[in-house]
């Protein structure tokens, strides 16, 4: 069963007898072929999807491999004990959503590269790339609704759709305020920045956990949302740090691209607060591509102790995570073994 679609229901009724009746029972994504065309042309839908989703397919191929999100969902399932097909369904939804969001993010950030290759909008154009990303947002919603219907009926499907909508709203609020800060050249406070990370980066992992826990069976009493949220925050703070410091990151995205994109990241905000007259604000407002200017900005952040402060914050989030994991596992160390191995690989060496 699929989400009822008023427009398709209307077309179906008009195509059959030219009248309008109540909308119900629409179970197909495929458009109704009417007005002299027969249903044998349904294959055109698949052909069109292949064309209009080329930017999405490009990123799915570019980013292929067992992602951290896939591994993490299985680590969480050690606490929940849910069927494998359910976990795979949720994981696919999160992966598709993540890749779709990257299509939009790279446009909004004006990024030229993604993992050392041209960003999708540089290859396919802004219009098609944006449409592909938005389309996948809705196909993911359809997929999780279908997964819920197959597993637990309308109640589970509706709960999953509600959670998805709720978290997508938060994700867009987080992305939106980050863009506003960037475009208005209005740096937020550190607390405002961390809240944005909770909405944006942490929200995607929290969505995955909440969808997993919609299953009617398993140990759904485990409170894993707080762990997922902090992992997301750690990811972004780590990204803030390595964007400025890691050579391998530079090869994939370009040197200190956060500076060129005009973003405000944690080390930048810490430095601006510590030394408002250091000249960093003026450099950041230029959104420079010039390597010398970017190196000067990084040198200022080093002088204000902001890169050390970033590492210290990463350490604090790490300690917080360790406490939360221990709280959820109790004495069952085997339950959290996979998650703890995952986290050890994620953490920056002290």
Swiss-Prot record:
GO molecular-function term, one example from the UniProt record: prenyltransferase activity
Quote the record's binding site residues for Mg(2+) 2. Answer: 105, 109
EC annotation from Swiss-Prot or TrEMBL = 2.5.1.-, 2.5.1.1, 2.5.1.29, 2.5.1.10
Q: What Gene Ontology biological process does one annotation of this record name?
A: antibiotic biosynthetic process
For dimethylallyl diphosphate, which residues are the binding ones?
Answer: 114, 200-201, 236, 243, 263
UniProt keywords (A-Z) are: Antibiotic biosynthesis, Isoprene biosynthesis, Magnesium, Metal-binding, Transferase
Q: What is the main EC category here?
A: transferase
> InterPro entries per the record?
Isoprenoid_synthase_dom_sf, Polyprenyl_synt, Polyprenyl_synt_CS
Cofactors, names only: Mg(2+)
Q: Does the keyword Acetylation apply?
A: no
Q: Which Pfam families match?
A: polyprenyl_synt (PF00348)
PROSITE patterns with a match to the protein in the record:
POLYPRENYL_SYNTHASE_1, POLYPRENYL_SYNTHASE_2
Chain positions recorded as Mg(2+) 1 binding sites = 105, 109
Question: What residues does isopentenyl diphosphate bind to?
Answer: 66, 69, 98, 115
Domain of life of the native organism: Eukaryota
Cofactor binding summary note: Binds 2 Mg(2+) ions per subunit.
**Quick one: which pathway?**
Secondary metabolite biosynthesis; terpenoid biosynthesis
Describe the reaction catalysed, as an equation.
isopentenyl diphosphate + dimethylallyl diphosphate = (2E)-geranyl diphosphate + diphosphate; isopentenyl diphosphate + (2E)-geranyl diphosphate = (2E,6E)-farnesyl diphosphate + diphosphate; isopentenyl diphosphate + (2E,6E)-farnesyl diphosphate = (2E,6E,10E)-geranylgeranyl diphosphate + diphosphate
State what this protein does. Answer: Geranylgeranyl pyrophosphate synthase; part of the gene cluster that mediates the biosynthesis of pleuromutilin, a tricyclic diterpene showing antibacterial properties. The geranylgeranyl diphosphate (GGPP) synthase ple4 catalyzes the first step in pleuromutilin biosynthesis. GGPP is then substrate of the premutilin synthase (PS) ple3 to yield premutilin.
Q: Which family does it belong to?
A: Belongs to the FPP/GGPP synthase family.
> PANTHER family from the entry?
GERANYLGERANYL PYROPHOSPHATE SYNTHASE
Q: What is this protein called?
A: Geranylgeranyl pyrophosphate synthase
Q: Which organism is it from?
A: Rhodocybe pseudopiperita (Clitopilus pseudopiperitus)
Write the gene name. Answer: ple4
